[in-house]
Amino acid sequence: MEEPEKIVSQTELDDKAQKLVEEKDADSRLRVYVGPMEKVLTAVLLIWAVFQVWANMFGTLGAVKLRTAHIMFLLPLAFTLYPTFKKERRRRRVMPVWDIALIAAAILSYGYLFMRYDAIARTGRLNSTDVWVGVVCLVVAFEAARRASGNLAIIALIFLSYFAVWGRYIPGTFGTSAFTLKRMIKALVWDTNGVLGTGAGVSATYIFVFVLFGAFLKYSGFSQFINDIALTLVGQTPGGPAKVAVIASALMGMINGSAIANVATTGTITIPLMKKTGYKKDFAAAVEAVASTGGQFTPPIMGAVGFVMAEFMCVSYTKVMLAAAIPAFLYYLSLLYSVHLEAKRLGLSGLSKENIPQAGKVLRERGHLLIPLVVLLALMFTGYTPLFAAIIAIFVTIPVSWVRKETRMDLETIVRATVEGSRSAIGVGISCIIIGVIIGSVNMTSLGLNFGNLILRVVGDGHLFLGGLMVMIMSIILGMGVPGVAAYVIVYVVAVPVLRGVGATEMAANMFCLIYACLSNITPPVAMSSYVAAGIADSNMTKTSLIAMKLGIAGFILPFFFLNNPVLLYGSTEGVAVSETIRTFATATIGVLAIAEGLSGLPMQKYSTGATALRLVTRVMLIA
């Protein structure tokens, strides 16, 4: 028998969530400045946002110079905001002296890079100054990464030391020749495969602009609109609060791109509401964790990781977005049905009518907030670039918010939205910069190719499911404790070649790695989303994670089926008839719903264990 729940205020819950997130997420441990330093920081964040929008709108800088200028803002801001150590006091009036020195080193070294890059690109020769400036560039980048995404910095250092120091001593497949310091610096700093590579490019363009767009949506009142719409749609159905959590977390998760932050933001409201309705605390925490995690691969924004995928695959973002649509829909449909079945099993009802806002009133008061999203999608589907579409959507958000007094963004709100957007782009930006080091290291040593060949020798050509199983395990392990964008890129480097080698299509291989890298957020032993949700709910972390894996079963199963049948990735396979897509979608829908039912506990009350297992196997076969 469970002990009675202690009544906790919303403020206490918010404080608790903040502490949990700070423990697992460096972005929540940012310094808070007071006095003149606060105004200076605000001004720099505003200037950075204006520069990024201007540079992406008019494109007067070349790609490399834009990336370098982006880093010249990014690193100093990281040293300003991220504490040197976890236990450091957050509230400050001035910066520590060592951070001022690091800021100077970052600006001078990357400023030198900005000025000298064209000359180096023409001649291909480095002098001693170029080499040592390159060393400083790497050192300051690693220090920023250590503060902002510690695990990622460690992984990058392992790759770097592998070919710089230890590679020559390793025999066989993973061995490599010796590299001089000059060659290493040229590859990782003075080339577009290192710190100035794809990661920096995506951070300086898509990620910054879409994070800024998400901040403007938030400050326009879009979050409240999502919550109210979810209440009107499913609030009165059995287990309504849990379904509201699923819908709200899905929509917010696709915008902010951080599963942990999403749990902390929406979970402090939805988890207590689910518990109050009658759900057990472990289940309530698991629902929030699963719903928040799926937002990272849910169109139209996909937490910015979709743009990285499009860049790597050299395809339009629209194609990636369409490919992700069916898997994301089935993931959330399965979760909603699981929540519904649990409510039925427990005999739970929905919220009373007086607690549900009227749909007409919600649409009248906040329906106009959908216009920026409609503009974004309309521009992308009519051929405009995602960058142009997002910038226009940002500018549209401001006048649209003026339609109603309740949502009106005044100058102060616009400034706050801009500052928060810039601040939110720092953590993921640092991850993207250091990802360049990982990619450059792997490319230089052929480690990814060698690793892929080793796995292919083990599984054999054409063994799609066996290769997929090995990549699934690898993706979950490499994705543990790493932000969504970084998790996908790390997995992409070593796993996509394996899947391509066993016969998967390019889109299927990339989507497979993305989904499993994201699902590491709910997979023990790390399961950071489950950890934060369990802390808010006062539930057992391991039990919460196991329930979360059961609730997110569609996410664990579907990737194997679109490896074999890429029709589930809409638009990724040419020559597929519409009727074939509809048939595959219909059978997959029936399959995931049937699996959710089989795992809900309801069939167990009527059938033996053997019969239930047989029913589950039959349902899995339906998806295929």
Regions from the PLM with identified roles:
Residues M1-G124, V131-V135:
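Conserved, well-structured core domains of diverse proteins
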Residues L30, A55-T60, Y82-R93, A119, ...:
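Membrane-water interface regions at transmembrane-helix termini and the short interhelical loops
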Residues L41-L45, R67-L81, W98-I107, V131-V140, ...:
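Hydrophobic mid-bilayer segments of alpha-helices in multi-pass membrane transport proteins
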Residues S128-W132, N193-Y206, T232-V246, T277-F283, ...:
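Membrane-interfacial loop-to-helix junctions in multi-pass transporters
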Residues E143, R147-A148, I158-T173, L181-Q224, ...:
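Core transmembrane alpha-helical segments of multi-pass membrane transporters/permeases
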Residues N227-G295, I301, C314, G484-A517, ...:
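Hydrophobic transmembrane alpha-helices that form the pore/transport pathway of multi-pass ion
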